[in-house]
Amino acid sequence: MTTVSITFDLLSSMQPRKWLKNQNFVGEITSLSFDDSGELCLASCTDDTLQLYNCISGKFVKSLASKKYGAHLGRFTHHSNSLIHASTKEDNTVRYLDVVTNRYLRYFPGHKQTVTSIDVSPADETFLSASLDNTIRLWDLRSPNCQGLLNVSSPVVAAFDATGLIFASVSERKYKISLYNIKSFDARPFQDIPLTFLPPHVRIANVEFSTDGKYLLLTTGNDFHYVIDAYSGSELLRVPSKVSTKTQDGNLTYYASACMSPDSKFLFTSYDNEHLCMYQLPELKQTVNSDHIVNSFTEMGLASTTPTSNSHSTENPLAIIPSSTSKNLLPETPSIVRFNPRFSQLVTAHSGVIFWT
C-alpha cells in the first residue's frame, strides 16, 4: 500500500513533472510495472527492449535488450534485480531475466499462442500467465515446469487478488468472470459471474482487483472501461476510453489505459490523447442477510448515479487533468496509466514515460 495519504485534493492537483525517453528509442511502450519497493518502474517496449526508470529520482536507469525474443508484459518478481516477460518473437515462452547481468535465468515454455496477461502472486514466488491458446498456466519461479493448467473455452486475461489466494479470469467470448481458489487451481471455479452488460465483440485488455478486494476493473480495447462489484458482478461504473490499439506482428496489443488508486477510492483513465480523467469509486456497504451478501451503494463526492447491472449510463469525472502543463514536457498520448502502489505517484506512458506528482 501507499506510504502517503491519498486525498482528492492531492490527486486532482497532480501534474506531469518529468518526461523521460531514451534517445535511441523509436517504438512505443506497451506495459508498465513497479517493483515491490515502488522505487523502480519497468516499461516493455515494441523495439524489443525493457526500460528501467527510478521513480524517486525520475531518471532513466538502463535498457535491457531482448532482440531475439521481443518483450511485452514485463513484471518484476519480488526481487528488484529480476523480472519476467512475455515473448513477441520466436515462440510464446515466458522468460525470467536477471536485471543486473541481462541474462536469462529460466524459461517457462508451454503457451502455443500470444500471452495476453502475466500476474505475479503477491503472496509467494508463483505467477499466472494467460494466452490466446485458451489456457491459463500457474508457474513457480523456481521451476520451468507448469504447476497448473486450465483449459478454457476462449481467450482470457487473469489476475490475482491482493491476498494471492483467489484469481479471476475474464473470458472474451463467454462474457463472464470466473473466480478460482489458487489452492484448487485445476478445479472448477467457485463462482462464475455473467457480464450481461458488456456489448458484443468487446475486447478485454486487462483485469485487476482493487487492493481491498471489492472491485474488479476491466479495461477494454473498445469504447469503455468497467468497474464491477467483485462479489455480485454488478456494473458500478462505466467510463469512456478512446485509446487506440496497436497491431504488433499481426496481433493486437491492448493497453492498460486505466487504473485504481491503492486506497481503492479513485479511478484514473486515459481519455482523449491529452488528458487524464479521475473518477471516484462508489462506496460499497456490505450487510449480511441470511447466507448471502447484500450490497448497497452510497454516492460519494460529485459522483452521479451509480449504474445497475443493466444500466448504460456513465459517471462524470471528478477532475480532468491535462497530460502536459509544462513547456519542458512534450505532449504524450497517455495510452498506459498506472499508479505507483508505494507512493502518491502516477505514471503514464506511450513513446516515453511521464511521472506525475
Curated annotation (Swiss-Prot):
InterPro entries: Swd2/WDR82 (IPR037867), WD40/YVTN_repeat-like_dom_sf (IPR015943), WD40_repeat_dom_sf (IPR036322), WD40_rpt (IPR001680). GO terms for cellular component: chromatin; cytosol; Set1C/COMPASS complex. One of its GO terms (molecular function) is chromatin binding. Its main location: nucleus. GO terms for biological process: transcription initiation-coupled chromatin remodeling. SUPFAM superfamilies: WD40 repeat-like (SSF50978). It comes from the Eukaryota. It is found in: Nucleus. WD repeats lie at residues 24-65, 110-149, 199-241, 247-289. Component of the Set1 complex composed of ash2, sdc1, set1, shg1, spp1, swd1, swd2 and swd3. Belongs to the WD repeat SWD2 family. The Set1 complex specifically methylates 'Lys-4' of histone H3. This is Set1 complex component swd2. It comes from Schizosaccharomyces pombe (strain 972 / ATCC 24843) (Fission yeast). The lineage of its organism: Eukaryota, Fungi, Dikarya, Ascomycota, Taphrinomycotina.
